[in-house]
A protein has these predicted regions:
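Conserved polymerase palm-domain catalytic core
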Residues: 51, 122-201
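Non-catalytic, polymerase-adjacent accessory regions of viral genome-replication enzymes
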Residues: 1-54
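Glycine-/proline-rich flexible loop or hinge segments
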Residues: 23-35, 64-74, 98-102
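Heme-based O2/NO sensor domains and their adjacent alpha-helical segments
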Residues: 44-61, 67, 71-75
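Non-catalytic, well-ordered alpha-helical scaffold segments
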Residues: 15, 42, 46, 80-89, ...
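Active-site-proximal segment of RNA-dependent polymerases
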Residues: 4, 88-145
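Short, compositionally biased low-complexity segments
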Residues: 11-27, 58-62, 89-94, 172
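Conserved pre-motif C helix in the palm subdomain of viral-like polymerases
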Residues: 70-100, 182-201
Length: 201
């Protein structure tokens, strides 16, 4: 029986992730890593498949950069972004079956438009006196890794996949020559962050 890291869907998910990356980075600068990855995709895919089978895959360090608005953002290498997208696609079926139907960020749930439509329907059927929108400041920056891994295990995610997610969470972030391993938080600059069930610290 194939393991969670060598099951047939992985090949299709890597191809889907490759198509996504090519589209998302279609206007990237000539020096962006996506162009080297596109040029050597067959070799990269074979290497990723082998590293998955051998459980030797590791993420590169993540660059912390400042955006035009002054915010700090983590920038992943092209290959790591592709792999995280493939991992997200691989996890979606398991998480979609077990997470609340109100989690509209999951694939097939309608996203922001679906959430807005649900609120409109609710207001139409039973008009409330007030509607409030809230957000917890620093919530994602304070996600506890051990709590997240425990929730993923309870949801039935295979241990080898949780190990990969742990490498993603405990990423090595670099800025101005300094390196720091992340002890908490998830990276919101990756395609994987929005697919996870977020437990509080």
């Amino acid at each position: 029986m194939p393991s969670a890291l060598t099951a047939p869907p992985w090949s299709a998910h890597l191809e889907q992730a490759f198509a996504w990356l090519c589209h998302a980075r279609r206007e990237a600068s000539p020096h962006h890593g996506v162009w080297r990855l596109r040029d050597k995709w067959d070799h990269v895919k074979a290497q990723l498949t082998e590293e998955l089978a051998n459980r030797t895959f590791r993420f590169s360090s993540v660059k912390l950069t400042r955006t035009a608005t002054g915010d700090l953002m983590e920038c992943w290498e092209a290959q790591d972004s592709l792999f995280l997208k493939a991992l997200t696609l691989h996890l979606q079926p398991t998480l979609s079956r077990k997470l609340s139907p109100s989690c509209y960020h999951l694939q097939g749930r309608g996203g922001v438009k679906g959430a807005i439509q649900q609120i409109r329907d609710w207001i139409t059927c039973d008009p409330p006196r007030f509607v409030a929108r809230s957000d917890a400041k620093g919530y994602y920056a304070n996600i506890g890794h051990s709590s997240l891994f425990r929730v993923l295990g309870d949801l039935g995610v295979d241990p080898p996949l949780i190990t990969l997610i742990s490498h993603y969470c405990r990423r090595l972030v670099t800025r101005d020559g300094y390196y720091a391993e992340q002890k908490k938080s998830i990276s919101m600059g990756s395609p994987h962050g929005c697919s996870l069930p977020f437990p509080p610290r």
